[in-house]
């Protein structure tokens, strides 16, 4: 599983002209799944994101987590995070999980995140063309891969 975590002042997701998700201060999480992802990967990623200390404290030091600031979150599925650009110029998405595997992983990730945060998480819609708008805060962007836990 790969995730791109963006600290935002605001973010929204629009589908067919209808805004389906809208947050203020918090995190926009783009999540991409592969066939080899496990329950342990989801649990590790959930804990890591929820507890990342990337929000400023009173001394303007990144020392607070989303949980600490009671921030909001949008999770958007994005299979293109699993792109391979090793060969040629056209990305290959062979590593991306097929919908029958990715959808349950995505839904489980959302449920785990809601349990970890103790509140609802807003989402996009799996497999749908979405317009994702955001106002970066910082900017702060973190990329995490469960296959490379550095």
Regions found by a protein language model. Give the residues of each.
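N-terminal, polar/charged subdomain of small-to-medium soluble alpha/beta proteins
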Residues: 1-89, 103-150
